[in-house]
Amino acid sequence: MLRKVFCILLAVCLSVPLACPALAADTPDVVEMPAVVTPLQKEPAAEEPAPEDPAEEAGTSEEDAPSGLAALFDDFRAEYNLTEQNFAVSYYDTVTQESYDWNETHMMVAASTFKLPLNLYYYEMENAGEIASDALMTQGGATLDLCHYLSIVESNNEISHALLYRIGTFPEYKEAMRKYFTMTDDEIDPKYYQDNYYCTRMMMDTLKYLYARQDEFPELIDYMKQSNPQNGYFKAKVTEMEVAHKYGSFEGAENDVGIFYAEHPFLLAVYTQNVGES
């Protein structure tokens, strides 16, 4: 399983930016659009599961043990010259609850991965009856239903920016997204509020939130499975399992975050910047 994870990481690290119009301007321009008053909710920080009983770890192999996992990641970073400036990763096994994080709170250009918590936010509003799926969201008359498809599957930026600014100002949108994150004020770099910056811990928190409530968001999961390109990023090295993901590509940032439906389903968030250029 871990060998597969590293193959997936490599696929992202060495990705060549795609010549796709939807990726031409991933970073939201901070331009005001008509605001819609929506609740800016926060959740209290969630507690991580307690460490596994040492007695249970005694029978695990070096590859599966947390220390072995850390060593493998160390070797991987060294081999591909990955540093705190160009790489961050968060991994979580949903069955064993084993996790690994490296550089996970470092703010990096999120590219189109920002569309995952953004769409999740609107799906929750729909489920709560706060907005209708046929509500008109753009000046061109696109409904929220259509916006979800275009934002997640086609990674359309204009549509996604319209959704973003319907929440309010850019800082208000960023505050609204914190509903899905466990990071405290002190843990969040202020640059988070200044531009399209996120970190892999934020994306992992979002993936955990979504995975724990999959039955509430079947369309979002399905759109993530359809997300184009079908043979790129995480899916470049994965053919034997379903993957629900949201990729991002913008000026050297090659990112992907998603759910892998393996025998042990796992969550993975990878951010890179200018990796694999030399």
Question: What residue spans do the PLM features occupy?
Answer:
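Beta-lactamase-like hydrolase cores
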Residues: V30-H106
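Active-site SXXK
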Residues: Q97, M107-M137, S151, L268
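Short, Gly/Ser/Thr-enriched beta-strand-loop segments that form substrate-interacting elements
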Residues: G232-S278
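Mid-domain, small-residue-enriched loop/turn segments at the edges of structured enzyme/sensor domains
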Residues: D101, H148, I159-D215
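Short, well-structured active-site flanking segments
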Residues: P28, E124-D145, E216-L220
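Sec-dependent signal peptide cleavage junction
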Residues: V16-V30
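Bacterial N-terminal signal peptides
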Residues: L9-P17
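A conserved catalytic-loop motif detector
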Residues: N196-E251
